[in-house]
Amino acid sequence: MFSRLSLFRRAALAPAPMRMSFRTIYQKTEDELPRRIVPKLATFYSANPNHEDRINRLERLLRKYIKLPSQNNNEAQQTKAPWISFDEYALIGGGTKLKPTQYTQLLYMLNKLHNIDPQLTNDEITSELSQYYKKSSMLSNNIKIKTLDEFGRSIAVGKRKSSTAKVFVVRGTGEILVNGRQLNDYFLKMKDRESIMYPLQVIESVGKYNIFATTSGGGPTGQAESIMHAIAKALVVFNPLLKSRLHKAGVLTRDYRHVERKKPGKKKARKMPTWVKR
């Protein structure tokens, strides 16, 4: 009985064990455990990390520049980009993990970014797309964006039939000179004067630009339409957003029609002499 009481007394009088805080325990375990390796890519745990990371970057660009105007179907076909093939992309996009559907997804997003109006693209889009061009076409694929010269002028060249025109367009009061002469003095026909003014009427800017044109070759109609073509191209430099409106009006596309040549045995290109029985 006494031995039991003595044991209880000793246990009661013994000092309590020291309690360690959570911070002390955590510091000890943190020092003992090895450092955790952080994945380089945020898509590390996906089936194809390299491809998914590139898709994420392209999606980020599309969301950022989704409001920029795009080219129409005809212009997109003319400026179709030569992208790298499936085998070439597999070297940087996951190797054997890459699937044809993933490559198709990549091409769709690349074409969406490439079809943005070239006048509005920037270095961020260009540098991202340059990774996917074929090496042989990297140098020839640089798009030169026209800008105003040091005097604030937009310079463009237009052609029609055998006529060629070079125009200088600057913001002003609406003065138009052709080969150093007034428009009414150089073109006597009302139709020729109207064709020159047509691009300005399309964008509702009559009287807002001064135009100085030099033209040579062909007749009055060919010279007037070559000046019209050059003015339309020069106006796009001032405001690239006008390109779609001028293209719909048909003044940005060169008219390649020519007078058909005369054939032997005929009076003109198609006209035959009157047939007489005898």
UniProtKB/Swiss-Prot annotation:
Main location as per UniProt: mitochondrion
GO terms in the biological process aspect are: mitochondrial translation
* Keywords assigned by UniProt, alphabetized: Mitochondrion, Ribonucleoprotein, Ribosomal protein, Transit peptide
- Per UniProt, the transit peptide runs over 1-10
The terms under GO molecular function for this entry are: RNA binding; structural constituent of ribosome
Annotated segments matching region Disordered: 259-278
- Tell me where in or outside the cell this protein is found: Mitochondrion
**One Pfam short name:** Ribosomal_S9
Output the Gene Ontology cellular-component terms.
mitochondrial inner membrane; mitochondrial small ribosomal subunit; mitochondrion
- Report which superkingdom the organism of origin falls in: Eukaryota
Q: What SUPFAM superfamilies does the entry give?
A: Ribosomal protein S5 domain 2-like
Q: How does it assemble?
A: Component of the mitochondrial small ribosomal subunit (mt-SSU). Mature yeast 74S mitochondrial ribosomes consist of a small (37S) and a large (54S) subunit. The 37S small subunit contains a 15S ribosomal RNA (15S mt-rRNA) and 34 different proteins. The 54S large subunit contains a 21S rRNA (21S mt-rRNA) and 46 different proteins.
Instruction: Name the family.
Output: Belongs to the universal ribosomal protein uS9 family.
Functional note = Component of the mitochondrial ribosome (mitoribosome), a dedicated translation machinery responsible for the synthesis of mitochondrial genome-encoded proteins, including at least some of the essential transmembrane subunits of the mitochondrial respiratory chain. The mitoribosomes are attached to the mitochondrial inner membrane and translation products are cotranslationally integrated into the membrane.
The molecule here is called: Small ribosomal subunit protein uS9m
